[in-house]
Amino acid sequence: DTTKEIVKKTTKLDKNFLIYGEPWKGGNSPLMNGTFKGSQRNENFSVFNDTFRDAIRGDNNPSNGFINGNQHSITCNWSIIEGLKGSIYTLTSNQNESINYADAHDNYTLWDQIEKSQNPSLSQGDYRKNISIYPLDNHFVRQDLLALSILFTAQGIPFIQYGSEFLRTKQGNHNSYNSSDEINSIKWSDKNKFIDIFDYTK
């Protein structure tokens, strides 16, 4: 109800306000009528589409998605098709309610997800070690770019985590809220190192 009231009041001021959030609770709550996936339909706010995220790259176990080995799964393929259409038959009433993403502030970065899903025993410090001076020749880099291409061509609102445009890694830390700056900081030198990926994303 709070979100609905905020939407109602802000759109009176400016119809271009964008209000979005996570359609799930962060834990136990005494509130009985929260907003859950699909219940926001026609309420004029947007939600993170984690079903589309998981179809693209796999869940946070980590598992595989369309880009990294699960492209023959009928369920995965239908979720990709539905996500490309803005999830208007499963999650939203229109595509503007869908925040399309492959990574965000929590869980694995897109790059870490790709590497970890292919090598579960990969250790901290070993991420991005096997990228040559020609990154576009790297199979994992091409998977990363495929994920971004899907996001940017899907109906809905594309969302990327800062640094994803140059293969951001948190060295496999999928829950880094209390980790060091070394893990959480943006390594701006990576923009120059992976300028081809940055330019592709731009």
Language model segments and positions:
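Active-site groove signature of glycoside hydrolases
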Residues: 1
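Substrate-access "cap/lid" subdomains that shape
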Residues: 4
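Conserved alpha/beta catalytic core and glycan-binding cleft of carbohydrate-active enzymes
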Residues: 7, 16-162, 166-167, 175-177
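Serine/threonine-rich low-complexity intrinsically disordered regions
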Residues: 14, 77, 123-126, 187, ...
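Extended hydrophobic/aromatic segments used for targeting, binding, or gating
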Residues: 164-202
